[in-house]
């Protein structure tokens, strides 16, 4: 049964990729749902910006790293790099993240390199293991920032994957884009891969491209720190 489930997920993933990143007529059938989704996203954003919904503002600057599309674009590696560079320049950064796939009974959670990934999720542990700064995980970014500032001496907060979390005020926004897939077919979910419209990118302070950048974007490249033996080879 587990094998059947694996192949089903693989087939579903391929189907979604064809719709989002290729030319597939199914994307047009999903456009009405994308319009509804876009209206909800816009209304939610306006509710925070107009003060209808409360926004938490930290006493220190908040730098958000995020994107407008679903999937991995390099947000976490960039957050790790920023934490390292800020530390080198004498700042005392702290990181908050969503705790994606974590199953903690209560949030937010203080994260260490040896924390249980079942509780806080893999990404939170990756952040803690690859930086020397405090990390707090939780789906409510505002509460996570509060917990971070209450327990740690931090003078700047890095928020990993936080662009759509408008309940948290931010001072700087960095959007990360996959240099190969870019924005796919340019449509909103579920017709395309976008969480927000491409126009949202005009509001950010910087666009970082994980790959070959377009005009006005900054390039990002992965660089290996070390080689590790992962198998028993003679």
Residue spans of the language-model regions?
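A transmembrane-helix-recognition feature enriched in membrane-embedded lipid enzymes
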Residues: 3-61
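Short, well-ordered turn and helix-capping elements at secondary-structure junctions
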Residues: 67-69, 163, 224
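Phosphate/Mg2+-binding loops and adjacent switch elements
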Residues: 99-219, 226-231
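Walker A (P-loop) phosphate-binding motif
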Residues: 45-113
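Residues at alpha-helix boundaries and short interhelical turns
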Residues: 23, 69-73, 135
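Short N-terminal or domain-adjacent regulatory/targeting segments
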Residues: 42-53, 214-234
């Amino acid at each position: 049964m587990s094998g059947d489930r694996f192949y089903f997920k693989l087939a579903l993933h391929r189907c979604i990729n064809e719709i989002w990143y290729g030319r597939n007529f199914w994307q047009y059938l999903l456009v009405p749902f994308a319009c509804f989704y876009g209206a909800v996203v816009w209304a939610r954003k306006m509710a925070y910006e107009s003060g209808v919904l409360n926004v938490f503002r930290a006493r220190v600057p908040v730098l958000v790293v995020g994107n407008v599309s679903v999937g991995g674009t390099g947000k976490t590696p960039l957050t790790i790099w920023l934490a390292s560079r800020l530390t080198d320049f004498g700042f005392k950064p702290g990181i908050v993240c969503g705790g994606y796939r974590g199953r903690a009974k209560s949030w937010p959670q203080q994260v260490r390199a040896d924390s249980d990934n079942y509780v806080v999720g893999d990404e939170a542990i990756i952040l803690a293991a690859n930086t020397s700064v405090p990390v707090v995980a939780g789906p409510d970014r505002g509460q996570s920032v509060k917990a971070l500032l209450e327990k740690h001496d931090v003078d700047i907060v890095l928020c990993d994957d936080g662009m759509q979390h408008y309940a948290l005020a931010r001072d700087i926004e960095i959007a990360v884009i996959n240099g190969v897939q870019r924005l796919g077919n340019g449509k909103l979910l579920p017709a395309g891969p976008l969480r927000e419209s491409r126009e949202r990118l005009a509001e950010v302070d910087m666009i970082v491209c994980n790959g070959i950048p377009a005009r006005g974007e900054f390039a990002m490249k992965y660089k290996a720190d070390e080689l590790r033996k992962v198998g028993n080879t003679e």
